[in-house]
Swiss-Prot record:
Bilayer-crossing regions: none
UniProt gene name: terb2
Designated name of the protein: Telomere repeats-binding bouquet formation protein 2
InterPro entries: TERB2 (IPR028065)
A GO biological process held by the record: meiotic telomere clustering
UniProt family annotation: Belongs to the TERB2 family.
Assembly, per entry: Component of the MAJIN-TERB1-TERB2 complex.
Source organism of the structure: Danio rerio
Function: Meiosis-specific telomere-associated protein involved in meiotic telomere attachment to the nucleus inner membrane, a crucial step for homologous pairing and synapsis. Component of the MAJIN-TERB1-TERB2 complex, which promotes telomere cap exchange by mediating attachment of telomeric DNA to the inner nuclear membrane and replacement of the protective cap of telomeric chromosomes: in early meiosis, the MAJIN-TERB1-TERB2 complex associates with telomeric DNA and the shelterin/telosome complex.
Single GO cellular component term: nuclear inner membrane
Amino acid sequence: MFKRKTAWFSDSVEKEVISFWVSEGGDISSWKTAGYLFSDDASSEDTKRIYGSEDYVKNRATVFHSSFLLACQPRQSVTSVPIGHYVLPPDFVQNEMKAIIGRFIWEKDEQVICEEQINPEVPKDILSGETEDHALRERSSQDDYQTVTSQSKVCSCCEMRQYPVNNMISGYVHIDQMRKYSGELKDFLPSLHGHDVSRSNDPTPPFHRKAV
């Protein structure tokens, strides 16, 4: 799956993830020559050095969260997983974004774990005396994302809020469904081409075009 691809891994990435990359034909190299840069912690020293590099400042390098590789594993495909959802920005950028979106896609696993703690599977021997209809209702209740729980089972996970279109957990448009564009592509740079970046407390996207 990763043949002829190179990657750099931060010390914060688990060894199992690195082993998976190698087992699928991927090579490991220095961050300056690697095609992919993976880290699990924006505050780790090796990752902060990349954030402070000229390559990163000039948009020649991008750091991704290694959970991208775990998302590729069950699909056995790199192209079916939008890697742009797994961009790992510096800590101060993450704090600004979390104030708007709630959390990043790689943090969804915390929500899954939290829901499992709230709605643990009921042992079969306990359900043996209940009717099939009641069991189905219990299962449906567990599958409901907005299950109402008692105060003694309060979830500490933060609530999803206005997840941006460019970093959605689900519902994104597949690349095969996108219309082809044959014109010239230009990078988005704040303060250039009549655009700027500002922060807003309303649910609208944070990018606005200047009034002409």
